[in-house]
Amino acid sequence: MSTQGFLKPRSIEVEPVGPNHAKIVMEPFERGYGHTLGNALRRILLSSMTGYAPTEVQMTGVVHEYSTIPGVREDVVDILLNLKGVVFKLHNRDEVTLILRKNGSGLVLASDIELPHDVEIVNPEHPICNLTDAGKLEMQIKVEKGRGYVPGNVRALSEDRTHTIGRIILDASFSPVRRVSYAVESARVEQRTDLDKLVLDIETNGVISPEEAVRQSARILMDQISVFAALEGAGDSYEAPVRGTPQIDPVLLRPVDDLELTVRSANCLKAENIYYIGDLIQRTENELLKTPNLGRKSLNEIKEVLAARGLTLGMKLENWPPLGLERP
């Protein structure tokens, strides 16, 4: 079957919106292809982009993440949260262990981390903590290359290593894509007015540009669907890979705290044992409205935050919760 009759985009425009933020406009597409390709690219952009993140930390004098450090104003939990906001970029390596040492009063920044020549910090002014006059901070930070979002408890289960006292395993958000959404608008070519225009709105953390993110996601999509183009007649055999446990979208494994809801909304969800985004999207609007202290305003907030990630309430998930998912 020939595909020559299908329209392909003749125009691709990149409209910068801000630092690491752009709108990418493509047109024309056959009717319906805007949603087909836009949704596929959005899901790949959110879950499958390669990036870098701190995965383990060891601090001098710290046994566990609920400790405090004399002379440091923030507790260890806050330090770890701030550390997750540091954007690393590794060149020609998949992992590295970095050192941070700081003494005396002042603000500790990402730029205080000692870097080898092939490691870069995209946001060196990012704050990590504050020290008093007698303060002293020393830590080892392991940074790894990966995809999507991997909870620390899942990584701990998959690793066959002796647990070291003071070794803190972090939830790792590798994805360099912070936000992505798409819209489909009407397009026209000559007398045809039933065509689609696809608008991708992408913001990254600076490790890659929005344009490069789209290129990488398109390559992943092409690679995955190329197997279908290789299918031939019924008499020809095709050896499919052995299927294991169906993979869960890494976005669904993120805690609801990552949605940055108001404290009231977040507490209401946790009171109903909703700890992960995968828990939340399976609830319906009516179920959430029955939650004590969660009103229509909070519900609308939740719906808006989910919509920004291409998710909705009332979705059905198979094999949820995944094996090994820890409950607080």
Curated annotation (Swiss-Prot):
One of its GO terms (molecular function) is protein dimerization activity. It catalyses: RNA(n) + a ribonucleoside 5'-triphosphate = RNA(n+1) + diphosphate. Residues 1-232 are annotated as: Alpha N-terminal domain (alpha-NTD). One of its GO terms (cellular component) is DNA-directed RNA polymerase complex. It comes from the Bacteria. Keywords: DNA-directed RNA polymerase, Nucleotidyltransferase, Transcription, Transferase. Its EC number is 2.7.7.6. One of its GO terms (biological process) is DNA-templated transcription. InterPro entries: DNA-dir_RNA_pol_insert, DNA-dir_RNA_pol_RpoA/D/Rpb3, DNA-dir_RpoA, RBP11-like, RNAP_asu_C, RNApol_insert_sf. Residues 248-328 are annotated as: Alpha C-terminal domain (alpha-CTD). It holds the Pfam family RNA_pol_A_CTD. The N-terminal domain is essential for RNAP assembly and basal transcription, whereas the C-terminal domain is involved in interaction with transcriptional regulators and with upstream promoter elements. Belongs to the RNA polymerase alpha chain family. DNA-dependent RNA polymerase catalyzes the transcription of DNA into RNA using the four ribonucleoside triphosphates as substrates. Homodimer. The RNAP catalytic core consists of 2 alpha, 1 beta, 1 beta' and 1 omega subunit. When a sigma factor is associated with the core the holoenzyme is formed, which can initiate transcription. This is DNA-directed RNA polymerase subunit alpha. It comes from Bordetella avium (strain 197N). The lineage of its organism: Bacteria, Pseudomonadati, Pseudomonadota, Betaproteobacteria, Burkholderiales. The gene is rpoA.
